[in-house]
Amino acid sequence: MSTVAAAPRVLRNRRAPRPRRIRPARIALHAFLIAAVALWLFPLLWAIYAALRPVSETIINGYLSWPKTLNFNNFTTFWTEADLPYFYLNTLVIVVPAVILTLLLASMVAFCCTQFSWKFNLVVLMLFIAGNLLPPQVIIVPLYWVYLHTPIPSFGSIDVGRFSFALFSDNGLLYDQYIGIILIHVVFQTGFATFVLSNYMKTITKEITESALVDGANVLRIWWSVILPLCRPALAAMATLLFTFIYNDFFWALLLLKTGDKRPITSALSLLAGEFFVNNNLIAAGALLAAIPPIIVFIALQKHFVAGLTLGSTKG
């Protein structure tokens, strides 16, 4: 009985936990994060506000005024008059082959540099990574000259309605061609993809490769049937990043594609700007519609994207 009776006394004698003291450093950190989120959301919210507002009202009252009407006319106008589905298809013709070729080439280089010991593997890896340190603006003039003087054969075209995809080239040159813009993206994205995939492949033990060699598999079979399935999370994460990087490109498409009908959707937005008048409300609606595909890709590959970033950070 004494033991049972003593239990409530012990509970009554316990001290209540002290309230956590709010430190000034934590307050400053939260204030900084809130300010960063506000700065990031402001352009997006402003674009949504401008896209929902009629341009006539903006011209009369200015951008910094309370809206009288909000509607989706700018979205419907951009979808129909700017032929948005055509430029979506135009962009996918550039992005999808560029992502696939970049992943294949980068995974091959990363596989050779991490799973085999040879004399210059580190040098080769550093050369691919060093390509990302070169500003694209440095090579504009020589690259533009190369594109204007590189002959490319033509093997006909694939015509689907208004869309016409030339097999290699329709003018005999690398300039103003889908293949040219695809190649430049592959060249500039392979270094970063090689760096990420090589770090991930370092977590794969070399005993797996050696066992496959003993079983009679050649190097190409090991890369395709053994290494790539193990790197699926990293490949999905890399595919998401590459899709976003290439899809959002404005510089290379504006420089290397002369024909407006061949440009991707990001650089095609510049075609809406007139010589004497720019409908910023319509451009804001177009920019929001152009952002939909990367969001869909990220949501679809989000699970693999997060797994690829976390699994590649530890070894073993």
Which stretches of residues belong to each language-model region?
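Short, Lys/Arg-rich, polar N-terminal cytosolic tail immediately upstream
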Residues: M1-I22
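A structural signal for multi-pass alpha-helical bundles of membrane permease subunits
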Residues: R20, A25-G316
